[in-house]
Amino acid sequence: RALKAEKYFDTNNADVYTMDINPYSYQQEILDKLEAERTVRGYTHNLVVAATGTGKTVISALDYKRFRKQNPDRPCRLLFVAHREEILKQSLYTFRAVLKDANFGELFVGNYKPESIDNLFLSIQTFNSQSFTEKTRPDFYDYIIVDEFHHAAAPTYQKLLSYYQPRILLGLTATPERMDGKNILPYFNNRIAAEIRLPEAIDRKLLCPFQYFGVTDTVDLDALKWSAGGYQKSELEHIYTFSGAVADRRADHVVTALLKYVTDIDEVKGLGFCVTVDHAEFMCRYFNDHNIPSMCLTGQSSGEERAAAKRRLVSGEVRFIFVVDIYNEGVDIPEVNTVLFLRPTESLTIFLQQLGRGLRLSEDKECLTVLDFIGQANRKYNFEDKFAALLSNATRSVSREIKDGFVSVPKGCYIQLEKKAAKYILDNIRASYGNTAGLVTRVASFTEDSGLELTLKKFLGSLPS
C-alpha cells in the first residue's frame, strides 16, 4: 500500500499525513451551511461557490471526513470527478492530507489505472471512454464530488449525473454562470448552499487586492467574425501575430503600457494570457527582444518544463511566462504579481480563473497589477459580467460604476479605465441592452446575479443610464 501511495507523490514528507488540517473560519462557515442544508432542508445535492484560492478542495475533503465519521457502518465510497489530470492529482493529495492517510484513493486518468475503484479520482474523459457505469451500480458511491461544476451542463457530464444516486452530491465551482446560458442550479434544488465570491474573499484578506488597468488596445475587433459564442481563434491569432506592422505595433503598445503602469519592471513576476501557441511565442520573442526576459508555455509543455518555468519566474531569472490553455485551473504560482490579458476572454469562468492566478497571497506581495487590453469589440462580447464579478455591490450597474470611478471595488483595490477603453465598454453595454435576447437573458439571471428579488423596479434600476 505504501508503494501505491508512491505511484503519485513523494511520500518522504510524512508530516503531511500526521498533522491535523483544521478549517479556517470562513471554511467552517461553509461546512456549517452544508450541514444545515442537509439536516434542516433535507437537501443532499449541494453547490459550493468559492473564489479561486479559497480552498474548495480542502472544504470538500473536510466535509467528506465528517460524512465518514457520521456513517461509521457504511463503506463511504468516494468518487471525485474533474476534467484535468493536474486537478485530480492535487485533489488526491489534499484528501490524503486531510484524512491523514497516505494510501487513500487512486487515480483513474491518463496512464494511471486503479487497483480498486472504491475511492476514485476520475477524469470525466475516462468515465466516458471506459463505459464506467457498466462497472458500478447507481448507488455504488456514497459521496460524489464534481469539481469545476460549471462544466457539468455539458453533454459529457450528463450520463454520470443521471446514472448515479449518491447519498451526497457536492458541486464545486468559482463561477456557476455559464456562457451558453445553461443553468447548473437545477441539479441543486435551484440553490447555492454556500458561497464566498471574489470580492468577499479579498475583503476578508484571503486573496490579495488588485489594481486593474483597462488599457485602450491598438486593434479593432469589431469586424471580426463572431460564432458559437466567441471570436474565431484563427482571426485573433492573425491580427495579434501575423499582421506584420499591426501586430508589431500592438506588441510595442503592450510593452509601453507595462512600463507605464508597473512600479519596477525588475520586480515583476508576470503571466501573459495569449490566444494561441504562435501568439504566445510571438509575445515571448518580442519581450525578449526588448530586454524583458520571458518564457512561453503551452498545454503541450511537459511537467518538467512547467516546473522549470515556475522556478525561473520565482527566482527572477525571467519576468514573464506567456501561456495558452494552462494556468487557468489548478496550478499555483503565488508569487505572480502581474497579469496581462492579451486576448478577449469570452468566458467569465476562465477570466476569473486567470485573474485568480495572480490573487494568491505571497510574502512581500502587496497587490496584483492587471493590464487588460480593451479594443472595440463585437456587440455580443460581454464586458459587463466581467467587471460586475470584481465589484462588492451587486445592485449598482457597471455603467454607473464606470461613470463614478468604480466606488464598489473590494478593500484596497482599484480599477482605472483609459478614456477610449471606457467608451468602448459603455457603448458595448448599451448595445447589449438594445436587443431582445440580451434583455431576456438578463431578466432570467437577475436574481442569481444580484442576489435581489426580481421586480420591475429593481431590474430597471440595474440598467445602464
Model regions and ranges:
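ATP-dependent helicase/translocase motor core
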Residues: 1-51, 58-76, 93-97
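Long, largely alpha-helical accessory region at the distal end of helicase-like NTP-driven motors
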Residues: 17-19, 250-253, 260, 385-465
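Conserved helix-turn-beta segment of the N-terminal RecA-like "Helicase ATP-binding" lobe
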Residues: 86-109
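Conserved helicase ATPase core of P-loop NTP-dependent helicases/translocases
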Residues: 89, 107-113, 132, 281-284, ...
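Post-DEXD/H (motif II) to motif III coupling segment of the RecA-like Helicase ATP-binding lobe
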Residues: 151-213
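Conserved interdomain linker/interface between the two RecA-like ATPase lobes of SF2 helicase motors
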Residues: 192-271
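Conserved helicase/translocase motor-coupling segment
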Residues: 237-311
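Conserved segment of the helicase C-terminal RecA-like domain
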Residues: 348-353, 357-387
